[in-house]
Amino acid sequence: MKERILVTGGTGYIGSHTVVELQNSGYEVIIVDNLSNSSADVVDNIEKVSGIRPAFEKLDCLDLDGLDAVFAKYKGIKGIIHFAASKAVGESVQKPLLYYRNNLVSLINLLELMPKHGVEGIIFSSSCTVYGQPDELPVTEKAPIKKAESPYGNTKQINEEIIRDTVASGSPINAILLRYFNPIGAHPSALLGELPNGVPQNLIPYLTQTAIGIREQLSVFGDDYNTPDGSCIRDFINVVDLAKAHVIAIDRILNKKQKESVEVFNIGTGRGLSVLELINAFEKVIKVEQRIPVRIEFAENNKPEDMKRLRAGMNVECIVNY
């Protein structure tokens, strides 16, 4: 019998790619998603890509009783990969209570139900934002956790502490915290990608929409960074590679390969790429007839959500080669 994995936020950008990789690896997947930033059509596309249709339950993870019913319906769930969360940095500044409610309570509900239903482990979708403004580059897992730069980043920090405190209290739960950098790209089939409801929050959707004329120009925030071209440098990681990292992590928990009950891994490439370099690479790959119009904008307070240079000093090879 295939081992069952619950994926919250499984119709989202990273979640949908992870569901495909889980199914390709022989897992049976149950998706829980409220579709607040995605579409049920994604389930159809997952089936087209993998040849397997995952179980899907439209449900908000704030609904404790609803989650309890899902665990009861799909008995024997062995692990959880928890993506479901509100994730827009700017919006979190405007709506902090929404973010604290959505991002904290959803995790608490899962942790409360895991022992009851015999779930062995959880992979938590964390973020490089937990490092705040790092002192050294590249950023390793040993880097100190600094003051969060937004309510969104703070929810990631708090959730990590919630997991640690829960495990320390004697809970039988095992956990891996994946702190990843900047997911980018799409599935090679082009059936899955970053298709948010409403206004995009990341660079690539804006870039593609500008290239096909949906948007008149692409806004780049800042040209005065201490970088070769003046634009922000990020560590971009392909979303399929990121999805595979989640499969490796769940394998690690279920095969009891962990060295500690709570482990942390940075997931990135360890190489920096500037925003303008990425735009130029995009133009070359798709062979645009004319350059994508770019407007440089500046935000107040030096854009605290943008860390000028952030690269991962990854420990991921430790779990790839376990």
Name each model-derived stretch.
Residues 2-79, 199:
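N-terminal Rossmann/SDR dinucleotide-binding element
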Residues 62, 94, 102, 150, ...:
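Residue-level signal for the nucleotide or nucleotide-sugar donor/cofactor binding architecture
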Residues 78-81, 123:
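N-terminal Rossmann-like NAD(P) cofactor-binding module of classical short-chain dehydrogenase/reductase
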Residues 84-87, 126-127:
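Conserved NAD(P)H cofactor-binding loop of Rossmann-fold oxidoreductase domains
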Residues 94-97, 101, 105-112, 116, ...:
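Catalytic helix-loop patch of NAD(P)-dependent Rossmann-fold dehydrogenases
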Residues 209-284:
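C-terminal substrate-binding subdomain of Rossmann-fold SDR/epimerase-dehydratase oxidoreductases
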Residues 280-322:
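Hydrophobic alpha-helical membrane-insertion signals
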